[in-house]
Regions:
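Mitochondrial intermembrane space
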Residues: 1-108
């Protein structure tokens, strides 16, 4: 499915999947089920690097701040390296402002 998306969206999704996998593997209390790379600020893509300074991820029906740098292979089909930092829980009153779906209403 990822090859059918626009290039920028595909790269964000590829890095978002990597973020969920790495968070789940290294931070056992979290079980991420969604990432919004552009939640609190625009994503930047430069050459083969995707940087999301204002991303968010959802775990256990709560949203948390996330920043990541995702370096892609030369063909941009896979992740070469990935670094991330998890932030604080995002208050529910800010979810709509950041386009973060309420887990109770999310149909995706």
């Amino acid at each position: 499915m990822l090859p059918l998306l626009e290039e920028e969206t595909r790269l964000e999704q590829l890095c978002g999947l990597e973020a969920m996998a790495q968070i789940a593997a290294s931070l056992k209390p979290f079980h991420p089920d969604r990432v919004v790379a552009y939640a609190r600020s625009e994503v930047t893509i430069s050459n083969d690097t995707v940087t999301a300074e204002g991303a968010a991820f959802r775990s256990h029906r709560r949203w948390y701040g996330l920043t990541f740098t995702c370096d892609l292979t030369d063909d941009r089909q896979a992740v070469r390296s990935f670094a991330f930092s998890v932030g604080k829980a995002i208050p529910k009153r800010l979810w709509e402002q950041y386009s973060l779906p309420d887990p109770m209403l999310d149909t995706d």
